[in-house]
Regions:
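Soluble non-transmembrane domains of integral membrane proteins
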Residues: 1-129
Length: 129
């Protein structure tokens, strides 16, 4: 095993949730931007809005002077999915009725390890009118 491979094995596993005394506390908010296509017969509606999740992961903390930035920002699907080395909460719409799209993703990482994920959501959901 090469030295570089060994050092990677000793680094903390960043794609799993942070280890701690309990569950990861995630603050969530959702701002509804529009409601479309109310269907009384199917008992569904479509909506769009902005989802914001904030949590703390000390493994993501960094020194701004060393990193050369006051905050790390990953924006767009490529940077978020391929470049950001972070675990993030998975969101599920339990009353989804076929449409659940997320776009415009941005992940902000503060020096203390506070992460904020913001993305737009377009979805259809069952609503029992």
């Amino acid at each position: 095993m090469k030295c570089g491979q060994w050092s990677r094995l000793r680094e903390p596993f960043l794609l799993g949730p942070p280890k701690g005394d309990g569950p990861v506390v995630v603050r969530a908010s959702f701002q509804v931007r529009d409601i479309n296509d109310l269907d009384d017969e199917a008992e569904t509606f479509e909506f769009g809005g902005v989802l914001k999740l904030t949590w703390h992961d000390e493994r993501q903390a960094f020194d701004p002077a060393e990193a050369g930035v006051a905050e790390k920002i990953y924006q767009g699907a490529y940077q978020f999915n391929e470049l950001s080395p972070a675990w993030y909460p998975q969101v599920v719409l339990v009353n989804e009725s076929g449409l659940f799209e997320k776009h415009g993703v941005i992940l902000r990482v503060q020096p203390d390890g506070t992460l904020t994920l913001v993305e737009t959501v377009n979805a259809a959901a069952f609503a029992f009118f």
